[in-house]
Amino acid sequence: MKIFLCLIAVVFLQGVVGFHVEREYAWKNISYEGVDPALFNIDNIIPTGFVHDAINKKIFIAVPRRSPQIPFTLTELDTTKHPERSPPLSKFPGSDKLINVYQPVIDECRRLWIADVGRVDYKGDEQKYPNQNAVLIAYDLTKENYPEIHRYEIPSKIAGSNTIPFGGFAVDVTNPKEGCGKTFVYITNFEDNTLIVYDQEKKDSWKISHGSFKPEHDSTLSHDGKQYKYRVGLFGITLGDRDPEGNRPAYYIAGSSTKLFEISTKILKEKGAKFDPVNLGNRGPHTEAVALVYDPKTKVIFFAESDSRQVSCWNTQKPLNHKNTDVIFASAKFIYGSDISVDSESQLWFLSTGHPPIPNLKLTFDKPHIRLMRVDTAKAIRRTRCEVKPRKP
């Protein structure tokens, strides 16, 4: 037992100190730049997703409208103007009519994609935010004020249930060197356990169902000494390296599962194709996650785990099992990892909301609970089981 406790202590110490975390934003509560604090409720400002534009040094952060008094559901943080630890968020200049956004994604053409679910997650504001079909929108980050350049309304029969069931999503530009027109978007639905595929060129969408999308068991969230059960299906998806034909492995996870699956995007891009994924293996007990990301530089997938308060890794060049996974960050302060991404400069970013999805959860705001961390991917895996060193000649 003493050895076990010592190992836990070492992991937590290294997670905070030893893995070269180069920047940390930490908020007790989030404010909006230029907005009277009386117009919003700080208790409700809980971000769930983000993405970093390494060229403009800006972070786009989604603050879903789960509760009233949220001025903007998509925000912007200019890291050059706000080097402070707890900066305010600014209104996203591309649109002021968004209803409810959970995650932004940047593709290789520097388009910012969002999936606006079209409804708020509470009752009482129907006139202000009337229910609409979910919509995919792309903005051009290369131009001032990010003009909208693409919009697609997802049919209700494809989007799924009447709640807000979207998890993560991935954008697949088939061949960026030849242009951006041939693009597919893959959106997870964790309630219906389906994967939505959108073909930008044909402006068509369809959904895929499969047993691997379903939750495997009840998952546990720990908070204030109590344990809460939850059960969610397909949630996270990330894309690997392209082959010469522009196809890539799509890696996906259910939120209540520790297995990782792979399917070729060649199958996803063909409407009606036989869906036959590969079960890559099991990451081990208590490693459930709702977000994952592939880093092309290191060939590593990183997982923001839901309850363990850690970020783990697996090198895709090795078989997947608990002996080939490792922890690159752990901290008691990293409460509920909700999103993780790698930017164009191979910087790994990960977000904890401090707000696990527990009904009627009451938070105190006496210390920072929302955290956004950054670390270079190569440094993150150094001296871990996820590092694969080149063979000596």
From Swiss-Prot:
Expression by tissue: Female salivary gland (at protein level).
Chief location bin: secreted
Subcellular location: Secreted
Keywords from the named record: Glycoprotein, Secreted, Signal
Coiled coil: none
Signal sequence coordinates: 1-18
Pfam families in the cross-refs: MRJP
Keyword Secreted: yes
Chain's role: Probably modulates blood feeding of sand flies on vertebrate species by binding and sequestering different mediators involved in the host response. Binds biogenic amines. Binds serotonin with high affinity. Poorly binds histamine. Does not bind dopamine, noradrenaline, adrenaline and octopamine.
Family: Belongs to the major royal jelly protein family.
Protein name in UniProt: Yellow-related salivary protein SP03B
Organism for this UniProt entry: Phlebotomus perniciosus
